[in-house]
């Protein structure tokens, strides 16, 4: 059994909370894409665990965890995150953590060039705005991967004669390319190589052939949960390009990032915030640059885990969700942070876009078009009561249930879970038939 949790909007939907809820039922939790540019917090028995690169299944003592080939890995950050988790009580984490030998390495020079590249991309964009990178070196690493000049984990841990010398040569070539590209790019390559020579031995026990690992698990009928990073609207192909991340964050990235054929995937859970947020620049049709937007931001505590940046806030955009559903094929949805809407008398929901009076059939790929659309809203009545203590779906206010039913009917996918508050246990389960 392979089930997948994916973000359906622009990230920060609350995927970690659903994974936290589900992880006790699984034998393996795997990451398929991204790096340490995403983040979420899981609370277990009052202890907060911050995850960025490592799979959340580490909180389950019976769960193995895999960083897949589609992930790009900054080794110092990997060990720093692991040590923080160990310090908080996950003392056996190393025994249950594995890394694909095919995962690409993020070096410090990738992070250095990230900001330089950001400035160039902002100059090339249609509106002159920054892309909004986290500065973690993710984009430059995927660029070296695509140009077939990157270094993978197996290059680092290979102990065959001459392997380290080959690694060093390729590494220095990558640094030299950046020095030629950016002119005054000063960088201590010797120091980083010395660090990686040390990491080489430390990393070896974690490294596996992830294709063999995953397919052996499937053969043995293990229960596998794939933990998505970022979200569909940040996908390099299907997101609001170029205001996206550098990997495939949708269902396609799950297959390529773990070496899985599509037929082995059973359930795809789409996580949807009850309103919409995004971090950084890029079009955002339902954004509310007004009192409503500020209210959503303040009540929802909309600040990024990884960057601390304020999230832009707006109403739920069902055009985005329907588009996301077409691509990812969600079998059920988790609506999160419904309680943030508790005090709103009326709640507008975006249901269609028009351009110069003409209705668009689907979410547009052209940002020049997207930036000019008018959003048509349906305004639904609020419930104006506190739902944070509610534990049963039937006990939700009628208008809250109508809001959820409107979403289900619009996208044609059942809602299985509803987040009713920030607490770990504040999740209402709704029986669905599939």
Swiss-Prot record:
Gene3D superfamilies, alphabetized: Adenylosuccinate Synthetase, subunit A, domain 1, Adenylosuccinate Synthetase, subunit A, domain 2, Adenylosuccinate Synthetase, subunit A, domain 3
Keywords annotated in UniProt: Cytoplasm, GTP-binding, Ligase, Magnesium, Metal-binding, Nucleotide-binding, Purine biosynthesis
A GO term for molecular function: adenylosuccinate synthase activity
CC per GO annotation: cytoplasm
Residues that hold GTP according to the record: 11-17, 39-41, 311, 337-339, 419-421
Binding site for substrate: 305-311
Annotated positions binding Mg(2+): 12, 39
Catalytic reaction(s) noted: IMP + L-aspartate + GTP = N(6)-(1,2-dicarboxyethyl)-AMP + GDP + phosphate + 2 H(+)
SUPFAM superfamilies the UniProt entry points to: P-loop containing nucleoside triphosphate hydrolases
Residues involved in IMP binding: 12-15, 37-40, 134, 148, 230, 245, 309
GO biological process: 'de novo' AMP biosynthetic process; IMP metabolic process
E.C. numbers: 6.3.4.4
Major location category of this protein: cytoplasm
Function, in words: Plays an important role in the de novo pathway and in the salvage pathway of purine nucleotide biosynthesis. Catalyzes the first committed step in the biosynthesis of AMP from IMP.
Family statement drawn from the similarity comment of this UniProt entry: Belongs to the adenylosuccinate synthetase family.
UniProt-recorded name of the protein: Adenylosuccinate synthetase
Species the sequence originates in: Lachancea thermotolerans (strain ATCC 56472 / CBS 6340 / NRRL Y-8284)
Taxonomic path: Eukaryota, Fungi, Dikarya, Ascomycota, Saccharomycotina
């Amino acid at each position: 059994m392979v089930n997948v949790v994916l973000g359906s909007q622009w990230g920060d939907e609350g995927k970690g909370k659903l994974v936290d809820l589900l992880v006790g039922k699984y034998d393996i939790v795997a990451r398929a894409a991204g790096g340490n540019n995403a983040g979420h917090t899981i609370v277990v028995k009052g202890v907060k665990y911050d995850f960025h690169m490592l799979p959340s299944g580490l909180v389950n003592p019976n769960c193995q965890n895999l960083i897949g080939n589609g992930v790009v890995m900054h080794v110092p950050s990997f060990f720093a995150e692991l040590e923080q988790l160990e310090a908080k009580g996950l003392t056996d984490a190393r025994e249950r953590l594995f890394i694909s030998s095919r995962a690409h390495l993020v070096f410090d020079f990738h992070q250095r060039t990230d900001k330089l590249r950001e400035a160039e991309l902002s100059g090339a964009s249609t509106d002159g705005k920054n892309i909004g990178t986290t500065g973690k070196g993710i984009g430059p690493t995927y660029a070296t991967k695509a140009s077939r000049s990157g270094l993978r984990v197996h290059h680092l841990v290979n102990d065959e004669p001459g392997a380290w010398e080959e690694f060093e040569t390729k590494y220095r070539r990558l640094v030299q390319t950046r020095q030629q590209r950016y002119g005054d790019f000063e960088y201590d390559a010797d120091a980083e190589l010395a660090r990686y020579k040390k990491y080489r031995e430390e990393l070896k026990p974690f490294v596996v052939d992830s294709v063999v690992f995953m397919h052996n698990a499937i053969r043995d009928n293990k229960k596998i949960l794939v933990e998505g990073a970022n979200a569909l609207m940040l996908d390099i192909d299907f997101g609001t390009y170029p205001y996206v991340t550098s990997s495939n964050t949708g269902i396609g990235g799950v297959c390529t990032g773990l070496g899985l054929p599509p037929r082995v995937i059973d359930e795809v859970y789409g996580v949807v915030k009850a309103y919409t947020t995004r971090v950084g620049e890029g079009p955002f049709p339902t954004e509310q640059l007004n009192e409503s937007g500020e209210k959503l931001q303040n009540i929802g505590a909309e600040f990024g885990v990884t960057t601390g940046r304020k999230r832009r806030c707006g109403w739920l955009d069902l055009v985005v969700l329907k588009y996301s559903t077409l691509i990812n094929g969600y079998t059920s949805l988790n609506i999160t942070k419904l309680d943030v809407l508790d005090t709103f008398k009326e709640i507008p929901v975006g249901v269609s876009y028009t351009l110069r009076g003409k209705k668009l059939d689907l979410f547009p790929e052209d940002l020049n078009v997207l930036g000019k659309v008018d959003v048509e809203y349906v305004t639904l009545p609020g419930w104006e009561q506190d739902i944070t203590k509610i534990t049963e779906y039937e006990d939700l206010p009628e208008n809250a249930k109508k809001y959820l039913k409107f979403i289900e009917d619009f996208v044609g996918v059942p809602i299985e879970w509803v987040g009713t508050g920030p607490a770990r246990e504040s999740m209402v389960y709704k029986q669905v038939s599939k």
